[in-house]
């Protein structure tokens, strides 16, 4: 004789609730949501970048206006390292995060060396840079 499922004894309504809860719990396994950055805080943090960078003009580093969505090594008038010029990486939020985490690992041979170790700081800086698209 076949034994009935313990879930069947709960009734259809409760079964659907359990099924929905299970699907919700398992759909988020392995996925981490990145918190949205705070552009206002990012602007304050960006002051630390201004030894080398500017939003509007090239300096020791290339200008950052329009960096989100731009391809690496393409700012007119900036003298890139061969590594950065040849990388041809599109500066998505994800790639900017990797670059800020460890510039030398992300593009070996790049001129940039400064690391931003705090994930919240990186998110805030990227939010600030997104406000300066073009």
Where are these regions (language model features)?
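Bacterial N-terminal signal peptides
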Residues: 15-27
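Gly/Gly-Pro-rich "capping" loops immediately C-terminal to redox-active cysteine motifs
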Residues: 39-43, 54, 58-93
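Short cysteine clusters
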Residues: 49-52
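Electrostatic cytochrome c docking/interface patches
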Residues: 26-45
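Bacterial N-terminal signal peptides that target proteins for export
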Residues: 2-18
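C-terminal capping alpha-helices of c-type cytochrome domains
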Residues: 92-134
């Amino acid at each position: 004789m076949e034994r009935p499922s313990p879930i069947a004894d709960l009734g259809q309504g409760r079964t659907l609730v359990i099924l929905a809860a299970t699907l919700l719990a398992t759909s988020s396994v392995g996925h981490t949501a990145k918190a949205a950055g705070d552009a206002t805080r990012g602007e304050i943090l960006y002051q630390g970048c201004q030894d080398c960078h500017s939003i509007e003009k090239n300096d020791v580093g290339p200008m950052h206006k329009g960096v989100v969505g731009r391809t690496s090594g393409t700012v007119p008038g900036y003298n890139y390292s061969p590594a950065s010029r040849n990388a041809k990486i599109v500066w998505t939020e994800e790639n900017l995060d990797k670059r800020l985490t460890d510039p030398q690992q992300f593009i070996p041979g790049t001129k940039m060396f400064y690391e931003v170790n705090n994930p919240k700081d990186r998110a805030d800086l990227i939010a600030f840079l997104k406000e300066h698209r073009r």
